[in-house]
Swiss-Prot record:
Protein name: 8-amino-7-oxononanoate synthase
Pfam families to which the protein is assigned, alphabetical: Aminotran_1_2 (PF00155)
Enzyme Commission number, as recorded: 2.3.1.47
Molecular function via GO: 8-amino-7-oxononanoate synthase activity; pyridoxal phosphate binding
This protein's pathway: Cofactor biosynthesis; biotin biosynthesis
Residues annotated for substrate binding in this entry: 24, 137, 356
Taxonomic lineage of the native organism: Bacteria, Pseudomonadati, Pseudomonadota, Gammaproteobacteria, Lysobacterales
Species this protein is from: Stenotrophomonas maltophilia (strain K279a)
């Protein structure tokens, strides 16, 4: 029997994505100035970045990177366990661990690599299970599959559902994993309830707070805002590529867990360390995030303004008090049409479609930054309301005439 033709398969899959409105072409950014971006030759006001505190272009952060690169070079030159672990890596790990109240931290090149490392190193035996929120980030879900562990999912934010799933998997070691702030909905996991579930079911509780640290509560993220610490959440992921404006991630945890990851996690062992200059930039960003409460205060005010203006215009908001503000569109084509109409008016907002979100839940994902102004927020909401009307009119005009009604 002939093998399937991979080229024919990918062409068929691409044609299907075209028909569904799910193509994802890359956009080329040539220049940035705060929240203004030149994209494919057009200047747009962006509301789709994860640079929540506006630190990616902060002068002192950029200066820290440049100074460290001039001293230490462009790269680490080796993995952490050979000769790539630099004093700047060590300083960053200690600073973040101290900030969030954990004994130790371990630096990774990305959040995806960190999530894979945690599950590959800890869920290593037959019958091990990872119970997860149905809407967890793809990196958490994929990590379970790639680690070879069993994956069980519970309904979104449902701590009782998590308990049921753990009870149905009594054999093998167990991990309960959740996002802290959910990247597509912007809501926050019920961490206190989930922590109790993990304790009762003898499961290791792991929180990926990529979108919470720097923003939620006093800046220490969703775990601290829930009044929890290392005794409740033995492992926590912090990313450097969201509120902290850089790239990379850290896993924070108990001494024994972090030591085990450093010695056995393949994504940590078999990759070159993050450039020391990037660690220097992240270190400065962490210090600013800890010190400059005005950034969070301004961001909180902008979130409240956006939601107030959106309600005034009758937009379909979701329950989020974080910088992630999704506006449901329903079908994929409407989301793309809305995003395109906004771009034509000078605004850059991403259309998020399956498989990133569930079927029928396509949306505009608006993300706010401390760099935005109230005028920009009001202008965006007005543009969204106008785009909604234009797209709805186009849909009505394209619809076939109604069938005649016979008595």
């Amino acid at each position: 029997m002939a093998r399937p033709d991979l080229t024919a398969r990918l062409h068929a899959q691409r044609a299907l994505r075209d028909a569904q409105g799910r193509r994802r072409p890359r956009r080329t950014v040539t220049r940035r100035d705060g929240v203004r971006l030149e994209v494919d030759g057009q200047w747009l006001t962006g509301f789709c970045s994860n640079d929540y505190l506006g630190l990616a272009q902060q002068f002192s952060v950029v200066n820290a990177l440049q100074d460290a690169a001039a001293r230490e070079g462009a790269g680490a030159g080796a993995s952490h366990l050979v000769c790539g672990h630099h004093a700047l890596h060590e300083a960053l790990e200690r600073e973040v661990a101290e900030w969030l109240g954990y004994p130790r931290a371990l630096l990774f090149g990305s959040g995806f690599a960190a999530n894979l490392a945690v599950q590959q190193a800890l869920l290593s035996e037959e019958n091990d299970v990872c119970v997860q929120d149905k809407l967890n980030h793809a990196s958490l879900l994929d990590a379970t599959r790639l680690a070879g562990a069993r994956l069980r999912r519970y309904p979104h934010l449902d701590a009782e559902g998590a308990m049921r799933q753990l009870k149905h998997a009594p054999d093998g070691a167990a991990m309960l994993a959740t996002d802290g702030v959910f990247s597509m909905d912007g809501d926050i996991a019920p961490l206190r309830a989930l922590s109790l579930v993990a304790r009762l079911q003898q499961a290791l509780f792991y929180v990926d707070d990529a979108h919470g640290v720097g923003v939620v509560g006093d800046g220490r993220g969703a775990v601290a805002a829930a009044g929890l610490g290392v005794d409740d959440v033995p492992l926590q992921l912090v990313t450097l590529g969201k509120a902290l404006g850089g790239s990379g991630a850290l896993v924070l945890g108990r001494d024994d867990l972090i030591e085990h990851l450093a010695e056995t996690a393949r994504p940590y062992i078999y990759t070159t360390a993050v450039p020391p200059a990037m660690a220097a930039a992240a270190l400065e960003a962490v210090r600013l995030a800890r010190r400059d409460n005005w950034r969070r205060s301004k961001l909180t005010d902008l979130i409240a303004l956006f939601r107030s203006e959106a309600r005034r215009h009758g937009l379909d908001l979701m329950a989020s008090d974080t910088p992630i503000q999704p506006l449901l569109c329903g079908d994929d084509h409407t989301a793309v049409a809305m995003s395109t109409a906004l771009e034509q008016a000078g605004w850059l907002v991403g259309a998020i479609r399956p498989p990133t979100v569930p079927e029928g839940k396509a949306r505009l994902r608006v993300t706010l930054s401390a760099l935005h102004t109230p005028e920009q927020v009001r202008g965006l909401v007005e543009a969204i309301a106008s785009a909604r009307e234009r797209v709805a009119l186009a849909v009505r005009e394209a619809a076939p005439p109604p069938l005649p009604v016979f008595a």
